[in-house]
């Protein structure tokens, strides 16, 4: 394929993830998007997570609990575009994987529960999006229920998430009185027809808010609705494509995912406005998405994707060029050329061999323990993609063995699980404890389960007096040595051998930062 043809193909790609607070409707929206992209024929309501529809749950523990702990990847075609959707665990407990998945996308869809507004998980995920000024499109969900005043929800997005919000459409009524949405840019009313499961309701439109049909539909409410729309126009931001691409403004759509309404309009806007694959920074140079030379990085490693094989799949975001079956690529960290004949692509748990993939696509490489998160692969050039960080854990436990003779297996298991990003492990300098850190409680359960299942090690967790962790470094060796001497009780080495400060309280961390101004305390660490 000639370069111009490759550039055309790349321009069609839209790679994004959905962020939301648990139960805001993310899984339902994911299903409806796949439905519009003809990727699934039946949108089974997600309440039946253990049913045959639960395409993305394949670790046994997930199947037992009916939650998606692992991020899946789904690709579907829509309106001459190719959409790559990276699913992020939305359960009450999520993990660092969720954060890292956001480093592999070009834009994000934020789903907000219209009744609850902006919730704390959304705030956290938004902070990660801010690291790269990721463009964000918003969908305010559950309009067929009684929700908060839409103006209030918009204000909350602006105040709490510090981003301008530009409504593209506006709801007419809500709950039982929900009539549909009015598009502020096309002067069209889209009538609400409830579509369930795999039925896509017909898009019934009325042109013109001042038309006779609109008056007939709205009856006694007609004047109120027109006044409200006037006020909304005056009081909200107008959509601006450049501001959206810069991560400064979010276009907002209203609808109901369960009622299958408003998702199509949102998807139409998304494929039209969301950026195609973006250029990426490496330590050496900027890599353009439409370069001929192949490059990509690993953002996630998933064990046991196939219970029959103890394999681990490394998820790679292709950043430039093209992957084709059987090609050679350079594993930069190891300085080795590897031939990749069996990369896989995914429809949530269905694995199929991939013939080729281009910039913006996600492929899975079989990993026998040699690939780590953050690894760069290229067509030979020495490159190291940046911006794929470790995030400081927020929860900590000491880990103890039921059988002390299995220390070796425990250390090997923890080493592998930390390389994979399932947990972070810390070895304090002054004692023989092993401390594990995580972003969500569920990560601890996953680690205990997998140590037992894969490494035959039974471990017990105990509370430990650690509130937060920071990676530390200092350019002045003398000052670093003094810091290490005075603070050795709080220092540990992480799984990669990096010096880490384990703070018992936030106050302790603040005092240490003040006391040692030459030491950098970092909440993230590049891989």
Swiss-Prot record:
Predominant location: cytoplasm
Example of a GO MF term: translation release factor activity, codon nonspecific
Keywords: Cytoplasm, GTP-binding, Nucleotide-binding, Protein biosynthesis
tr-type G domain span: 11-278
Top-rank lineage group of the source organism: Bacteria
Purpose of the protein: Increases the formation of ribosomal termination complexes and stimulates activities of RF-1 and RF-2. It binds guanine nucleotides and has strong preference for UGA stop codons. It may interact directly with the ribosome. The stimulation of RF-1 and RF-2 is significantly reduced by GTP and GDP, but not by GMP.
UniProt-recorded name of the protein: Peptide chain release factor 3
Organism: Teredinibacter turnerae (strain ATCC 39867 / T7901)
Gene: prfC
